[in-house]
Curated annotation (Swiss-Prot):
This is Uncharacterized ABC transporter ATP-binding protein MJ0089. The keyword Nucleotide-binding applies. The lineage of its organism: Archaea, Methanobacteriati, Methanobacteriota, Methanomada group, Methanococci. Residues 6-239 form the ABC transporter domain. SMART domains: AAA. It comes from Methanocaldococcus jannaschii (strain ATCC 43067 / DSM 2661 / JAL-1 / JCM 10045 / NBRC 100440) (Methanococcus jannaschii).
Amino acid sequence: MSLMILSVDGVEFAYKSRQILNNIKFEVKRGEVVSILGVNGAGKSTLLKCINKILKPKRGTILIDNFDIKNLDNLELAKKVGYVPQRAEGNYMTVFDAVLLGRKPHIKWEVSDRDIEITHKVLKLLNLEDYALRYTNELSGGELQKVIIARALVQEPQILLLDEPTNNLDLKNQLEVMKIIMDISKSQNIASIVVMHDLNLALRYSDKFIMLKDGVIYAEGGREVINPENIKAVYGVDAYIENVRGIPVVVPIG
């Protein structure tokens, strides 16, 4: 089995005459957590939507497990990619049923014992068993976010795409959600690609970083790319990096 699960090569995307992504090229290995960083409007969410075929690039190639996504129908893609959107709202549906919906790509005629088993397994993994019969519109933001991640996980994906998964969460839930993403990526050999605004959360839980600026990759690599020079260039903010108990912390200046 190849370690490489995602290859993005020369991807470009534009809204009418406005170029959003330009010659995007990178690769992701199984088990990696990759943070996509940059200011609002840099193209981060657009990139995730291109990988998930929500948007169609005007040029470039995206391979998932060596399959060109252009040749995958929505059902085939949903078996390979789990997508957690930026915003999720609860509704009058139990947590169990909301998570079970993620099995839709695998269900043929009716819900199988395996579908039920996997749903229970993922609920347990995310400590959601006690919430199974609660309605999603009764949940807190952090609880609902875990339900949406659980729904993506029951798809048994090879890749998780998460668009600002810690948005609107308190500090405790931010840490818990990111630790869940990191632990699941390692234990299940899933590649997780996460759009992030919080550099310190990204540094704490990610293996690799892709910094976008004006629709192009400005910097890519490990923790070494999160440095004062790149932060200044990408965000326009002066900062220094402090090491706290082995964890690098970005400290803005002024």
